[in-house]
Regions:
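Catalytic phosphate/metal-binding cores of nucleic-acid and nucleotide-processing enzymes, i.e., regions
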Residues: 1-209
Length: 209
């Protein structure tokens, strides 16, 4: 048995529409790119750097300025997580990603399946040729996985007795950037990782998805 979950900008936009229904007073959206704003002094003059350029800062894009092309499709990176020093901000991010995971499980009819033996592969296809580290998205995988795998009841748990192995790889697709979550399910008695990999490869070989 296999499952394929594909996260695209279109899918995240669909989640944002749901999010706005649930949170009608929200001013920004959890999975949208930040917008760059110019900084001004109280008298209206621009704030300048030492080199004379106008200072800017990034902030969450407002709901009124948001459009589907602003949606994120990739998993949060460790680089993005490690710079967060405020515990409340970190907890808020974990909460949003967990809720997205629960929503994905509901959308794909995976909630409460309580599966007990599987392997999971995360594949992130970027729209640029930036050379990303595969392990850089491991932190983000944990956040979305808590909602998708555990809180939704899709799996019994997310420990290594349930998910083993876990694969991470990155790729490039300018026309269709996305994150694929590929899941192969096995009988409880199958523990050999290499046999699982063989079956998983057959499940998702080119043209077999």
């Amino acid at each position: 048995m296999k499952y394929l979950i594909t996260i695209t900008k279109e899918l995240v936009h669909e989640y944002h529409l749901y999010y706005m229904q649930q949170n009608p007073k929200c001013k920004s959206l959890p999975f949208a790119k930040k917008e760059t704003i110019k900084l001004f002094n109280k008298n209206g003059t621009p704030q300048l750097t030492k080199s004379g350029a106008q200072k800017t800062k990034k902030k969450s894009i407002s709901k009124k300025n948001y459009k589907m092309s602003d949606c994120l499709y990739g998993i949060l990176s460790l680089n993005e997580l490690l710079v967060i020093q405020n515990r409340m901000v970190m907890n808020g991010i974990k909460h949003h990603w967990g809720n997205l995971g629960i929503w994905l499980a509901d959308k794909y009819n995976l909630s409460n399946l309580k599966l007990s033996n599987c392997m999971v592969e995360f594949r992130v296809f970027s729209e640029t040729l930036a050379k990303k580290d595969n392990d850089n998205i491991s932190g983000g995988i944990k956040f979305v996985g808590d909602g998708l795998f555990v809180q939704s009841g899709f799996l019994e748990d997310d420990n290594y007795m349930i998910i083993n192995p876990l694969l991470i790889n990155c790729g490039y697709d300018k026309l269709n950037p996305r994150t694929e979550i590929r899941i192969s399910v096995f009988p409880d008695e199958l523990k050999d990782v290499y046999e699982k990999l063989r079956i998983h490869t057959e499940n998702f070989k080119e043209g077999g998805v």
